[in-house]
């Protein structure tokens, strides 16, 4: 699909963040909360879970404030090729995501893409 890299990231990133937080909260929540405190200026007293979720929403809000399209559907993309896209990510990009920040497999990639519709 003909989407610039930055726009694609703006669409996918909040959904990737939600996926990571849901699937590996013990590791991800402190990192996202730290991002919220150190980059977005959140109050650490609000707690890790609150700040992690707020960081995701604030990130999505930031992309919206730039006027960036928020869904893959806005580009005429549906789920027809999500399986192929997931396979491409796993083979043509960096490969094994099972040991990443929040492990992501083929089904996880499809879940993130679907949430981005």
What is each residue range found by the language model?
Residues 36-117:
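C-terminal charged capping/lid subdomain of soluble metabolic enzymes
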Residues 1-58:
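Active-site segments that bind and position negatively charged phosphate/pyrophosphate groups
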């Amino acid at each position: 699909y003909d989407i610039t890299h930055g726009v694609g990231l703006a669409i996918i990133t909040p959904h990737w963040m939600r996926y990571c937080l849901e699937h590996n909260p013990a590791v991800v929540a402190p990192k996202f909360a730290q991002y919220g405190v150190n980059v977005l200026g959140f109050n650490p007293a609000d707690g890790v879970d609150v700040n992690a979720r707020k960081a995701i929403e604030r990130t999505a809000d930031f992309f919206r404030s730039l006027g960036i399209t928020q869904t893959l559907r806005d580009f005429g993309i549906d789920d027809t090729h999500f399986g192929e896209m997931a396979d491409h990510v796993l083979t043509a990009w960096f490969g094994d995501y099972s040991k990443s920040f929040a492990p992501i497999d083929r089904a996880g990639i499809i879940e993130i893409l679907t949430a981005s519709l």
